[in-house]
Amino acid sequence: MFLTGDTSPAEDNREATLPQCSLPELYACIENFNKESKKSNLLKMHGISLNEAQEVLARNLNVMSFTRGADVRGDLQPVISVNKMNKPGKHRKTPSPKINK
């Protein structure tokens, strides 16, 4: 497609002055944009800032780890208790009370 109109050397110089950045700078800019977008979405959807959301999440994780740790200690207790029984014929003899007739 051809452009119609006046093309002067001044316009060509303007093209050379466009801002340029390196690839790492571009990635950093995009990453920053994504972070800001996430912050904005949290604020719009939940009325909460990113820092507040992180604090709430940290509190919830601390509570979960505390309760999970208590459950682990509870699991160390035996679930089934076994009574050891002697084999037949190996009973301990107890003296029977003597009855006087």
Curated annotation (Swiss-Prot):
Name the UniProt record assigns to this protein: Uncharacterized protein C9orf153
Gene this chain is encoded by: C9orf153
Superkingdom of this protein's organism: Eukaryota
Source organism of the structure: Homo sapiens
Pfam family, one: DUF5532
